């Protein structure tokens, strides 16, 4: 029995790609047809590759491997955080900071700073400081929690990275390639399947599509670690349109690592 059925994918809009003029020709093997100027993804291939991805991630989880979920677009952010937490994995859902993996030693110092500030806040130590200093440290804490909260317990670079929107998260892809970290990625019709290890052709703009695919990948990790899936639980509803969003790619260029008291651009 397939991990995800054609009916489930159809209902979630997994088959809708981008406009034909925005396609990447390398995705042609995964495209079934076009309709009204929009490419339609071949869901038979998606189902097959989902089985491959599920089995791979379950196997890796059984071996104790660590996973990082990456998805910073607004449709994916809430899903990424919830599903990563559900299966005991790490996540980045706000902004990919340059060197997040390739310069992990430096990023780790910021993570340590985050944990130190959290301890001081919980113990009440910040309340003993002058108001101005305490306010500055709390702003720093909020910023670090926003960007690094999802990797707070990550001790080393991950063994496998799961990506939503490979084109948008290309900085993450490049760092994974440099470190030979396997990538499992949702690929819309404007993406490049050659730069990931296990491609999953799917609509990466619709909330229901992202929720279905990412949820199944989280299931694989959970099953690998616990031997069976937990009882089906209610998921949060993620607000937002399921339309095809356009975005300014220059906004998501390499980001500098935030320093103390400095807001990332």
Curated annotation (Swiss-Prot):
A Gene Ontology molecular function term of the record: structural constituent of ribosome
Entry GO terms, CC: cytosolic small ribosomal subunit
Keyword field contains Magnesium: no
Disordered: annotated segments: 231-265
Pfam families on file: Ribosomal_S2
Alphabetized PANTHER family for the sequence: 30S RIBOSOMAL PROTEIN S2 PROKARYOTIC AND ORGANELLAR (PTHR12534), SMALL RIBOSOMAL SUBUNIT PROTEIN US2M (PTHR12534:SF0)
Name used for this protein in its record: Small ribosomal subunit protein uS2
